[in-house]
Every structure is written in structure tokens, then in C-alpha cells.
From Swiss-Prot:
InterPro entries xref list: Ion_channel_UNC-93 (IPR010291), MFS_trans_sf (IPR036259), UNC-93_regulatory (IPR051951)
Top-level taxon in the UniProt lineage: Eukaryota
Species name: Drosophila melanogaster (Fruit fly)
Localization of this protein: Membrane
SS bond partners: none
Keywords linked to the UniProt accession: Glycoprotein, Membrane, Transmembrane, Transmembrane helix
Name recorded for this polypeptide: UNC93-like protein
Amino acid sequence: MTGFTNAGFENDEPVKPKAGFEPDTASLREKVVLNPGEKWRILKNISIISIAFMVQFTAFQGTANLQSSINAKDGLGTVSLSAIYAALVVSCIFLPTLIIRKLTVKWTLVCSMLCYAPYIAFQLFPRFYTLVPAGILVGMGAAPMWASKATYLTQVGQVYAKITEQAVDAIIVRFFGFFFLAWQSAELWGNLISSLVLSSGAHGGGSSSNTTVSEEDLQFCGANFCTTGSGGHGNLERPPEDEIFEISMIYLSCIVAAVCIIAFFLDPLKRYGEKRKGSNSAAELSGLQLLSATFRQMKKPNLQLLIPITVFIGMEQAFIGADFTQAYVACALGVNKIGFVMICFGVVNALCSILFGSVMKYIGRTPIIVLGAVVHFTLITVELFWRPNPDNPIIFYAMSGLWGVGDAVWQTQINGLYGLLFRRNKEAAFSNYRLWESAGFVIAYAYATTLCTQMKLYILLAVLTLGCIGYVIVEILYRKKQRKLKKQEKLEAAEKEKEAAAAAAAAALAAAEAGADGVEETDDELDDLEEDIVVTRL
């Protein structure tokens, strides 16, 4: 262009950057431009993912709640559930981050949901060599599915908060609350299906057996129940095969419907900044480096302190789904009443999930978690001494419903707390959540066939106590850090005002606001996504 050639560089070739290289600065990354009306589309997507999970778990929860009773021989049902959560632990460590990076959040959800179908189908041919491998497949697909769900809710929650100018933590908890409202309502539909089918068929006559159940049999129900000594109990017989077939076909249809809902109606997360959580350096990491993200997250003190309560969440769900249904409901009332009692759990759980998600912004997180702890401490203590009797069925429904209150607290508040504390590493953080929750399931199912119910209740009490202690420490550290950050913001703002004392009032105010941006970012502060979302206010 200038007519001048430098011979000294004649044979030199510029070094080209690697394909896909992008400067690691927020200012050069592509911005996500959204208008305020996008909030309605976000709410639509939240509804879609919630409905899909509701339909999916209508099938799985309904099936899982029956396992310890309809497949009680040799503990097959409980072993298959244990296989699910053991595989889920392994899957949480190795799969979610890799699969989400490869398939994106939406298609990870689709593929993972399909993994549930074989387990439902093999209920027609229950053997150790069919149900256990099918359970392992469910576990391998579950971790990426739950991590994808949590990532989607958290990321669109951040975008929604920026569009509506609301607090991020309140929005995230509200979205999780709505999700768990739909998800826990699956207990209602799944158990309603199983109860109606079992009550309308030949096994519906089983209700007669529970009216004439002997006092001798009742002595071994409740806290005295031991799986190894339950043989010959009339209320624990497997329902007829035609009823199992009908239930399984209905549940299989639910799995297919859930997959189609996600595939055809959910917007990809890239619309809201997927893969913009930082630079593209994450995409350049090797597979081993991506796998190590989950392990690195475990080194964080906050996560370590939350491990006991996360393990308890898995254990308490395993107890209500396997031990309570078998030792209390099936033992005293009959298998055909399991669904009806668990409907109460599902309805209360769903209503409390949305309630707690909404009131959290008014009363804070701590009072809600205190409520959950008190409810579960009380229920576990009562169940140690309560002797179930079919003449008082209302007590079964009350215990089930109150357990739903406690579970709703943990599901909404602890999920939301993970999303708040570890925003910059959402996939790895929620993989850890699912890992330790799954560990709780595995622990509970591992001793399900060897320990009596009384000992299981004592173990629940011990783990809940440790979990509450860990949560209290996390809450204290978080509030202390927030106070420190606010103090730092005030000091920096004051310094800016002092430097700009000679400037106009508007300039001084702008300088003060700029000073607040100098706070060091940590896990429970701003996500890089905040810089990439531009809201056009037209």
C-alpha cells in the first residue's frame, strides 16, 4: 500500500491464532442483547422445563415408590434403586461437565431423559440382570440431566434478574421453587396412576387383607420393621402381572412425552449466553481438565460444609420412598394404599415448594430452613415411637404431608444456596450437589435390607444434626463476607467522592457508582454473564 518493502521480513509469516481463539476480555466478547419483553419468554422456558420434569417423574417416582413393595423378593427393588444412585455418584464425577459442553444444555436434557425408559420397561420382567443394569443406565443419565436443569434455571434466572432489576438470589430461589412445585406434583400424578390401577384390579381386594391384618403382624410394622423378617406378611405380596403391565405402559408413555416437550418447545440456552460465562478458554480445556472441575469445586469450604445436609436430602428422600412406604404404609394398610398416602406427600411438597420460593424474599432463607429442620427432627422422633394401625389412616397421610413440608424446604433452599454461592462454576457446583445427594440415597439403600427401621431413624437424626451445624457455619461466613464487601464498597465510594469533590454533583455520583465496581469478584458475587447481557429499554 505504501510502496515500501522491508526485505528483512520478506520470508516471515505471521503466527496465526488457533482456531476458535478469542481474547479473554469481557469487552471483546459478543454481547447478548435482549429487550424487557424477553422476560415472558424466559418464564415460558421455565414452565416448559418444569412441565417436562413433572411428566418424566410422574413415571419414575411412581415406579420408585413401589420398588420396595412390589419387588420385595431378595430385596430386588431396593437393590435396583441402590444401583441407580451408585451410578449417579460416578456419573456426577465424570459426566455432566463433559456432556453439557459437547451436547449443550438442551440436548443433554433430551438424551438423559431417554435413559429412564429401559428401567420402566423392565418392570415387566424384574430380574437382577434386567433391573440392575437398567438402573445403572438411569443413574448415568440422571447426573447430566439434573446438572443441565440447574444450569438452565440459574443462568436464565440471572438474565431475568437483570432485565427486571431484581435481586439475583431471590429470582433463582423463586425459579427453583416453581420448578419443584411442578416436579413434586409428579408424586401426585405418578402415585394416583398406580393407586387407581392397583385398587381397580384384582389386587384392589388387598384392602380386605389390611382390615383383617393380625395384631402379630402389626407388631412388626413401623420402627420395629425389619426387611429380613417380613416374609409371609399378607400385605406385602406382589400385585398381579396385568396390573404391573398397565402401569408400566402408562409410565413409558410419560417418558416419551417428556422428551418431546424438551426437544420441540425449550429454547436453547445459547439464547441467554451459554458458553459466555467467561472466555472461551473453558472450551479449549482437555477432557481431563473438564473432569477435574467437579473435584476442584469440592475444595471450596462452603461446599464442604454443605455436604452433610446434601447427603441428608438424599437419605430422607430414600426413607420416605422406600422405608416409610414399606415399613409403615404397606405393612399396615397394604400395597394398594402406598400411592394414595404418597399423593399427600407430593401435593404438600409441591405447594410448599412454590410457597417457600415466594416468601423467601420477605423473610429470608434462614427462617425457612429452621422450619424444615424442626419438622424433620419432630417427625423422625415421632416415628421412633409411633406404632402404625390401619384403624387410624389419617395419621399416615399427616406424616406423609409433613415430610413433604420438610423436603420442600431442603429442595428449594439448598438448591438455591448452591446457585447463589457458586455462580461462576454452576455445572461443577450442581454436579457436586447431585453427587452428595446421590451418596445419601446410596447409603440409605445400602443398609435398607440389613438394618431395621429404628436404626435407620437414628442415623437420619445424626446426619440431620451434622447438616444443620454445617449450614449454620455457611450462613455465618456468607453474612460476614457480605458485610465486608458492603463496607469495602462504601470505602471505595467515599474515596471516589473525595477525589471528585471539585466536579459537578452528577459526575461525583457517577464516580461513586464506578467505585462500587472495584470489588473483587468471588464465587458468591457477580458472574461474568452479567457483563455480557445488554438490556435495551425502548
